[in-house]
Amino acid sequence: MPHSLVLNLLPQSPIPPQYLTGRHLHALFLTLVSSVDKELGDRLHDSTADKAFTLSPLQTNSSLLKGGREGSKLQYSHQQPIPGGTPCWWRISLLDDTLFGKLTQLWLNLNPNRPWHLGPADLYITSIQGTPQSIQPWANAKTYAQLYEEASDAYGGKLRNSSINLIFSTPTAFRQGQYDTTLPTRESVFNSLLSRWNKYSGIEFTQIAIESIFPSFVNIHTEILADSRSKFIGILGEVTYKILGTVEPIQIKQINALADFALYTGVGRKTTMGMGMARRLQGTGDRE
């Protein structure tokens, strides 16, 4: 069962920008895991380990308010410190019950007086959201069976049946052979979703009708994230994909289930470092 959890955090002192990178947030997550299961934390630290989780960059509460529809714009890099006392949030998604079960002790025994460390700053976890919120669209939880059963399987009267509007909220890139590509083609996006769905859901889709998916609206641009160790180029923005032609209802259902799954799994590379955060926007209608 995938969970999209939002941790609300309060730093006690400024967090310098060099400690707000995906690498440092990844380390903080492993520290959280190790606090309840050191063996699991060590295993996840192994670069070859199955990493059934994704992480967001650290957000200030204003991140959901400054532009973008439905909280679609997120802050993915920081040039200035986050001041002490600034309410922040951090999205952690867990893609299987094993990992969620291990971390249940952490959620249930949450000590608001225990500090966690991000660089020189102490952070307190003040609350955790795990269900949909009107002002926090990144929190949710559904079983894989629910995602599949609730996915539309027909064109019908609802516009969303044949139109999938995905927002890419942090820089997104895909592996193509030995290199990265930033173009969100139907193959790159839906094969990324399909691979993770088949890995974790227990409801295998042997083949989806990728040839019936067509981009109909594209509003994207590239961003470059560079630090002392690496450079990452990815796209941000919005793409609407339409399901066109003669398509079996079960294939429509599978494509819609994958699109809804994007909230939890993200797409493309470095999703455990804050990249590739994507989400389906509802109620946007068809774009011509």
Task: Please describe what each predicted stretch is.
Residues M1-E288:
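RNA-interacting cores
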